Amino acid sequence: MANLRESSRDKSRWSLEGMTALVTGGSKGIGEAVVEELAMLGARVHTCARDETQLQESLREWQAKGFQVTTSVCDVSSRDQREKLMETVSSLFQGKLNILVNNAGTCITKPTIDYTSEDFSFLMSTNLESSFHLSQLAHPLLKSSGLGSIVLISSVASVVHVNVGSIYGATKGAMNQLARNLACEWASDSIKVNSVCPGFISTPLASNYFRNEEFKKEVENIIPTGRVGEANEVSSLVAYLCLPAASYVTGQTICVDGGFSVNGFTFKSLPLR
């Protein structure tokens, strides 16, 4: 009997059964993979996106798979829409939320001297301000759940230079520090906060870059694993950080990049043995 109880406890450490989650930007790419990963582990998930048509297409696929997913349209760069989103989530989940994944984000690639004030404001509001404000709004719901977890989807561009734009890298670097601050401030409320930094991942956002075969080959050559990552290789880490099994992991910035961020210069022709 004791063994059965221990086995049951072990299984619950690796399950999200009965938990609730909000994932922003969940209709494609990493966000879509995160929605599916959390739902497969038993969570009830609400997700949002700007494109209603794409959101409904994804919803039909999730329903066909038997996932417990609901959706709403939201542009996270809008403060009013963020507040409306959290009201929806609070109503759906009876004022309690276990998981918040701040995934929605965007990138404008330009030389620094070509950025406009509008570019700066848009990137800041979409990437950083939305993560900050949604975390603020979600705090009472996460606290009420008794077991809360926030994951901020940052970028490898937050920890090393990647020439995709200085403002983008700055927003993501600030997200990492936000995660550290909230992890310490909200630990007493039983809320964990971590940031995940994807490297080059095969997503709709990156597809425009990878159409350039020369660029793609250059990227693959600098990644130790020799390939671009897949969205589900990011979502698996996100899901782990939300599990009871990861209860002691908080305030961390974790790269999912095939070793890109730690790679120096590899001498291809130099024999190592």
UniProtKB/Swiss-Prot annotation:
Keyword NADP: yes
Pfam family, one: adh_short_C2
E.C. numbers: 1.1.1.206, 1.1.1.236
Oxidoreductase in keyword set: yes
Binding-site residues for substrate, renumbered to this chain: S155
Enzyme class: oxidoreductase
Gene3D superfamilies for the chain: NAD(P)-binding Rossmann-like Domain (3.40.50.720)
Reactions catalysed according to its record: tropine + NADP(+) = tropinone + NADPH + H(+); pseudotropine + NADP(+) = tropinone + NADPH + H(+)
InterPro entries membership: NAD(P)-bd_dom_sf, Sc_DH/Rdtase_CS, SDR_fam, TR
Keywords carried by this UniProt record: NADP, Oxidoreductase
Binding site for NADP(+): 22-46
Family membership: Belongs to the short-chain dehydrogenases/reductases (SDR) family. SDR65C subfamily.
Other comment: The hydroxyphenyl ring arrangement of Tyr-209 determines the tropinone orientation and the formation of either tropine or pseudotropine.
Functional description taken from the UniProt entry: Oxidoreductase having both tropinone reductase I and II activities. Involved in the tropane alkaloids calystegines and cochlearine biosynthesis. Can use tropinone and nortropinone as substrates and produces both tropine and pseudotropine. Able to oxidize pseudotropine in the reverse reaction.
Protein name, entry field: Tropinone reductase
